[in-house]
């Protein structure tokens, strides 16, 4: 469920007409619903209420500091994968003991910053990383809680670019090597084992891969405890998917996901961490755009809008589907016409949808791309020298710009001409 609904013939974000946001902020613009973000976070929190837990929002999904503060004030922890994300979480007021640092390529400078500031735990992904972290922690005179991300070789049944738990993926340590890795960590100064980490992919719409992975984690927990390691915490990652098309079958809900976790690892007495991102933010945001032209081509018609692939890359990168709807509610039974919905960028790949059936659309009409809250604004670029678009947060009948539209001067001012060209 989300809070983007038609009311009085106009699509609203909670109690605010999207047409009002377009008038005052302009288009394109990302618009988020605070009520939807909070509802989705609380669904996860309630799904794990049977035991000690922390829901760590995956900052990479939508990293605006206002969104992080909204979720943090509700009790969320944060899963970060870079110093930049860590700094965003801290800027949002998230205490270090609620920040988990993940990622396959942590640098020494990132480690130093995080260890100086404090962190809940660091999820290690390789032997070279754990040795580097040991050296850095020793030099700083601190002991850091760590888990090891194990790769369970489980097929997540998702897009190949967002699958992370197969043996040929770059993430984690093969589960077959886990005992040896934990044994080495026990000898390294500055590191204190507190648990196990696993994450098998994103946009999963089937619970069985989770069940298989968590069963392997449960077995490994018993083995590592027998070896003398204190396995007190299980970071089970994220990945639960969302319905990008209203016609999709509904994916599992957090309550069902929480039940799988309890069935597979609940008997171990561990604190549970999860790292949802897409399900919290995905349907909590839309990309608001305006039709520039309706172009009639040879054999197909085009809606050319002012948003482009630099604003929302998912259709071009993943072939992803987003429901696309007019802001003005079409009349019941209105005629439908097939359009290719495209942006202004000079690539054929700048296509949001092909042969998508839409009611009559004219230049100036507003259109909303649904389910754009996750991996939308965070993956935007300035390709074709297009400024980054604003982000707007709605709560009830109020809204605020939480990131202003980038100006051309701001974009160009970062470039520097060397003196020998002047």
Where are these regions (language model features)?
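Charged (often Lys/Glu-rich) extended helix/loop segments that serve as interaction or gating elements
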Residues: 260, 268-422
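Short acidic, glycine/serine/threonine-rich loops at helix termini
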Residues: 67-68, 91, 111-116, 133-136, ...
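Hydrophobic "anchor" residues on beta-strands that sit immediately upstream
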Residues: 56, 145, 233, 271, ...
């Amino acid at each position: 469920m989300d809070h983007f609904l038609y009311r009085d013939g106009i699509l609203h974000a909670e109690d605010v007409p999207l047409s009002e946001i377009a008038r005052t902020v302009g288009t394109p613009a990302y618009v988020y619903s605070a009520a939807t973000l909070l509802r989705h976070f609380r669904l996860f929190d309630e799904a794990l209420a049977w035991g000690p837990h922390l829901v760590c929002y995956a900052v990479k999904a939508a990293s605006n500091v206002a969104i992080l503060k909204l979720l943090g004030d509700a009790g969320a922890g944060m899963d970060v994968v870079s110093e930049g994300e860590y700094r965003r979480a801290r800027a949002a007021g998230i205490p270090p003991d609620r920040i988990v640092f993940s990622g396959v390529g942590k640098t020494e400078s990132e480690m130093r910053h995080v260890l100086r500031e404090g962190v809940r735990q660091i999820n290690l992904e390789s032997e070279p990383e754990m040795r580097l972290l040991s050296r850095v922690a020793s030099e700083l005179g601190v002991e850091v809680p760590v888990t090891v991300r194990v790769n369970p070789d489980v097929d997540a049944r998702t897009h190949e670019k967002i699958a992370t738990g197969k043996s040929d993926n770059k993430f984690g340590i093969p589960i077959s090597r886990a005992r040896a890795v934990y044994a080495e960590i026990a000898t390294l100064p500055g590191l204190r084992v507190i648990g196990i980490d696993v994450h098998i992919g994103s946009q999963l719409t089937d619970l069985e891969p989770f069940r298989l992975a968590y069963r392997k984690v449960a077995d490994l927990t018993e083995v590592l405890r027998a070896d003398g390691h204190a396995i007190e915490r299980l970071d089970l990652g994220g990945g639960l998917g969302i319905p990008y098309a209203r016609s999709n079958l509904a994916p599992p809900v957090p309550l069902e996901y929480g039940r799988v976790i309890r069935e597979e690892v609940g008997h171990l007495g561990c604190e549970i961490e999860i790292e949802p991102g897409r399900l919290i933010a995905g349907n909590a945001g839309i990309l608001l755009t305006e039709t520039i032209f309706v172009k009639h081509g040879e054999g197909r018609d085009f809606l050319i809008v002012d948003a482009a692939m630099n604003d929302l890359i998912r259709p071009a990168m993943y072939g992803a589907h987003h429901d696309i709807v007019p802001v003005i509610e079409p009349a019941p039974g209105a005629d439908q016409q097939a359009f290719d919905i495209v942006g202004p960028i000079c690539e054929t790949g700048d296509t949001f949808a092909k042969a998508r059936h839409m009611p009559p659309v004219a230049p100036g009409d507003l259109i909303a791309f649904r389910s754009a809250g996750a991996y939308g604004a965070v993956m935007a670029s300035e390709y074709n020298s297009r400024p980054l678009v604003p982000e707007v947060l709605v709560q009830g009948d109020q809204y605020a710009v939480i990131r202003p539209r980038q100006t051309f001067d701001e974009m160009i001012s970062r470039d520097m001409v060397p003196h020998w060209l002047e």
